[in-house]
Amino acid sequence: MSTTLPDIAVTEPSALHAPLRWVGMQDIAIPVRLDEAEPSGTVAARAQVQVDLPRPELKGIHMSRLYRLLDRHLEQPLSPAMLSQLLQAMIDSHADCGSRAARVSLAFEVMLRMPALRSEGLAGWRAYPVRIDAQSRAGRSEMRLQIDVLYASTCPCSAALSRQLLSKAFAQQHAGQTALRVEDVAQWLQRNGSYATPHSQRSVAQVRVDLVARVQSFDIRALVLLCESALATPVQAAVRRIDEQAFARLNGANLMYVEDAARRLRKELAERYASFHVAVRHFESLHAHDAVAETGSDADVFHMIAESHGQ
């Protein structure tokens, strides 16, 4: 009796002959070493690894080879160069399958410590969902970095309507008065400044950029800061009253429709990336539905409508 363990993926042909574009594994739990990750330098990630299967007669690929390669390469710090090496190793490991393409996806949250708006020495942690996609085909590698950034959006129309109500209330209460002291006006505003308030809401921008060849690092923090600077109203972590007041001022100075947010991001990204995509979503506090907008570079042409996930 043979003691050799059977491997039917190799010894048995496929009953249905057809090449497969991608075969592999997804949702693999694995630690990733990331120099930008605070405080430990390691993040818990979910990975996908796949190769093509062009030989139609083969029953399957060697999944364990892909897992071992992923595990071995992710012992190194994450970098574009390391992912390129992993992709080539995946293709080489499936030479007997005729594989010519491989792709990897990593999804994780990176924790970044961000300072408060005004309070000296005060800072807090914010979590940013990150996804990195890498693909190699015919000797050419492509990589994409995607992040989610949370921010606040205050409706310009609602702000205008609120100002109108406040103006009318002031005019009605001071009808017939030809002269008002500055102190009296200031006191009236202190009591009635919230006569009507515009609606605002937490919002999210999902930004994806294509990385150029030979880039040395993913530089996630730089992309986060670029997006938050463009939007001007990123959500905060640690706050005191002085920081909350500063945040209120930023929202008042940066009233935004969803279209405004998308265009702000487009302007900044277009100056630094040849190919990018932006999807913004405002979780409306006035409506029972969300407002969304998308934009991208000229190289970013067609996208299916994204599946909605309630939050």
Curated annotation (Swiss-Prot):
<comment type="similarity">
    <text>Belongs to the GTP cyclohydrolase IV family.</text>
</comment>
<protein>
    <recommendedName>
        <fullName>GTP cyclohydrolase FolE2</fullName>
        <ecNumber>3.5.4.16</ecNumber>
    </recommendedName>
</protein>
<dbReference type="GO" id="GO:0003934">
    <property type="term" value="F:GTP cyclohydrolase I activity"/>
</dbReference>
<feature type="site" description="May be catalytically important">
    <location>
        <position position="155"/>
    </location>
</feature>
<dbReference type="InterPro" id="IPR022838">
    <property type="entry name" value="GTP_cyclohydrolase_FolE2"/>
</dbReference>
<dbReference type="GO" id="GO:0003933">
    <property type="term" value="F:GTP cyclohydrolase activity"/>
</dbReference>
<comment type="pathway">
    <text>Cofactor biosynthesis; 7,8-dihydroneopterin triphosphate biosynthesis; 7,8-dihydroneopterin triphosphate from GTP: step 1/1.</text>
</comment>
<dbReference type="InterPro" id="IPR003801">
    <property type="entry name" value="GTP_cyclohydrolase_FolE2/MptA"/>
</dbReference>
<dbReference type="Pfam" id="PF02649">
    <property type="entry name" value="GCHY-1"/>
</dbReference>
<comment type="function">
    <text>Converts GTP to 7,8-dihydroneopterin triphosphate.</text>
</comment>
<keyword id="KW-0378">Hydrolase</keyword>
<dbReference type="GO" id="GO:0046654">
    <property type="term" value="P:tetrahydrofolate biosynthetic process"/>
</dbReference>
